[in-house]
Amino acid sequence: MISQTLISTDHYLSYAWRCCLFSGKRNAVFPSLEMANHQLCEPYLSHLIVDMETLTTSRLEALETLRQPNLCNRGLHIYLLASKDDPAQMSFLRAAGPFHVIARDLSVVPFRQALLVPPERSIHAPLFPATEWKILSSLARGLTMKRIARQLNLPYHRVVYRLNTQLRLLGLPDRQSLIHLLHRLTLNRHHQTL
């Protein structure tokens, strides 16, 4: 029975995971969330670590998968490894769900410690509610604010208000910054290296 699963295509990280960090533990490494799908609903899986920098799908698609209630509501600790060089992305990942976000470039000892002793999520930590998540994912797909308001059956000014609230929580200066962030989150690794 696998209790810890790492999703990564980084061979160095996968090797370190198996041989140095948690050797002898019941762990597995998969190159994608799709390939690990059969493991994700197992009741004995306690830790899911997703390397957001090496995903073969977009980060936003991965977050959609990880936000599913069957994963979030059963006590599974979900860790997202991300580059600390992009603070806006780190804030977005923290707000996207009940995830523990860890800087990807930590050395071995702090990295292992972060996984062994998960931090308690602050009661005041902002999470995107379902409606705000729909607004953000619709914006990422290129829909206009008016169209989003129609789809959600909300007045336009309510959509603008909700979006501005999320901008403040993320510490972004304006909507254009959010659009750029969402664009980066919709790119997969192949598009980022072109």
Q: Where are these predicted regions, by residue range?
A:
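Regulatory hinge/linker segments at domain boundaries
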Residues: 116-137
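Basic, Lys/Arg-enriched C-terminal extension of HTH/homeodomain DNA-binding domains
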Residues: 167-194
